[in-house]
Curated annotation (Swiss-Prot):
Disulfide partners: C98-C314, C109-C306, C112-C303, C117-C296, C125-C286
Species classification: Eukaryota, Metazoa, Chordata, Craniata, Vertebrata
GO CC entries: chromaffin granule; cytoplasm; cytosol; endoplasmic reticulum; extracellular space; mitochondrial inner membrane; nucleus
Bilayer topology annotation: Peripheral membrane protein
Protein name: Clusterin
Length: 451
């Protein structure tokens, strides 16, 4: 601190009519008493950061177990999809069986499918009916009843959903990594205080504190973080912006997506043309029909002749085909079950991250300020320096009341700060410096914590 600045502060107080209470040689004792309080608060904050680190390490272990479960579920899902594709291919090679019966039904099924699909599209979607109608007619003309007979669009559903799950997983994984890195940064910055500033951390019971939290094997990041890291770059500059904010927008976005996704999964498109529709589902249906006319095949249950195609039994002509179809259906059901399981696991992981990030934010708001002291060097006189103690001008409305005391301090590397202590607490009362140190630290926290 520059001496001219202190002189000006002291002069300013004297000019206001204040009276010096403490001789200069006593200021060091007050500084030492205040620094003792600050040291205890810093120690408490570092222990709070330790709680953050412990929580994050525990979460990381649970995360690794979750990754293993996700990988196992994904593997089983992919095996079931692969089997379904193989059975579909084998069925396609035998589609000439019962071909005459199904072709006849197909010619009556197509007009109904087109009419039903366009009716739903016109009701849900704002524009593009003419183009969609032409695309749908071309699609139906080059398709065969086999598409309906084997429920082929269910495989398309599985493949599309797999892509969405992969994107969602990558997003979650990257955000988890950012949270993990943020906690690690706060911890590492806090541990910079060990050394000249806090030599007691080098001896029991604090000895080995830092080393105890250095993992023997660094976590392997499964997903490149470049894309999302750029989007969330401000988080690295100001980690106190909030861990919870990493996951809350993603949770809301995913909730909308899943609400629509499950609706499409559980109901045929024809079922969307009801009063229970919602706008997110409508948008999804419109987009799907515009992108892929095959989505209209879901409406087969709305058309009698299409339902009859589903009921065609070719077992008398070719028992093997009937067996293949049964195997195909079994594989599809299994793949759908594992797909739902994977979604549930991702949702559980995301909910856990919301809870953990909220708790980390609470700890960070309470203790994270200590990480701002990482590059600070403590002098021989401690972190809190008392520069002036003056009695303020008595209250004219109550002259008999003791005048408040004005104290000027400097805490850490902050600017000098003027604080007021009630007049009934004298400067030699132990509570005096506790009040001063507490006020100074509270002011520092407010200016160094980003809500």
């Amino acid at each position: 601190m520059e001496l001219p600045l202190l002189a000006l502060l002291s002069l300013g107080l004297v000019c206001q009519g204040g009276q010096g209470l403490v001789p200069p040689n006593e200021l060091k004792q007050l500084s030492a008493a205040g620094s003792k309080y600050i040291d205890a608060e810093v120690e408490n904050a570092i222990n709070g950061v330790k709680q953050m680190k412990t929580l994050m390490d525990k979460t990381s272990k649970e995360h690794q177990a979750m990754l293993h479960t996700l990988e196992e579920t994904k593997k089983k899902k992919e095996e079931a999809v692969k089997l379904a594709l193989e059975k579909e291919k084998q069925l396609a090679e035998k589609q000439e069986v019962c071909n005459e019966t199904m072709l006849s039904l197909w010619e009556e099924c197509k007009p109904c499918l087109k009419h039903t699909c366009m009716r739903v599209y016109s009701k849900m979607c704002h524009s593009g009916s003419g183009l969609v109608g032409r695309q749908l007619e071309e699609f139906l003309n080059r398709s065969s009843p086999f598409s309906i007979w084997v429920n082929g669009e269910r495989i398309d559903d599985l493949l599309d959903r797999e892509q969405r799950q992969e994107r969602r997983f990558e997003d979650l994984e990257e955000r988890f990594g950012l949270m993990e890195d943020g906690v690690e940064d706060i911890f590492q910055d806090s541990t910079q205080l060990y050394g000249p500033a806090f030599p007691f951390f080098r001896t029991p019971p604090f000895g080995g504190f830092r080393e105890a939290f250095v993992p023997p094997v660094q976590r392997v990041h499964l997903v490149p973080r470049r894309r999302l890291s750029r989007e969330l770059h401000p988080f690295f500059q100001h980690p106190m912006h909030g861990f919870h904010r990493l996951f809350q927008p993603l949770f809301e976005m995913t909730q909308h997506m899943l609400d629509g996704g499950h609706g499409a999964w559980e109901h045929p498109l024809g079922g969307f043309a009801t009063e229970s529709r919602n706008f997110s589902t409508d948008r999804m249906v419109c987009r799907e029909i515009r992108r892929n006319s095959a989505g209209c095949l879901r409406m087969r249950d709305e058309c009698e002749k299409c339902r009859e195609i589903l009921a065609v039994d070719c077992s008398q002509t070719d028992p093997v085909q009937s067996q293949l179809r049964e195997q195909f259906e079994d594989a599809l059901r299994l793949a759908e079950r594992f797909t739902r399981r994977y979604d549930d696991l991702l949702s559980a992981f995301q909910a856990e991250m919301l809870n953990t990030s909220s708790l980390l934010d609470q700890l960070n708001r309470q203790f994270g300020w200590v990480s701002r002291l990482g590059n600070l060097t403590q002098g021989n006189d401690g972190f809190l320096q008392v520069t002036t103690v003056f009695s303020k001008t008595p209250n004219l409305e109550d002259p008999s009341a003791p005048a408040d005391t004005q104290v000027t301090v400097q805490l850490f590397d902050s600017e000098p700060l003027s604080l007021t202590v009630p007049g009934d607490i004298s400067w030699d009362d132990p509570r005096f410096m506790e009040i001063v140190a507490e006020q100074a630290l509270q002011h520092y926290k407010q200016n160094n914590t980003i809500e």
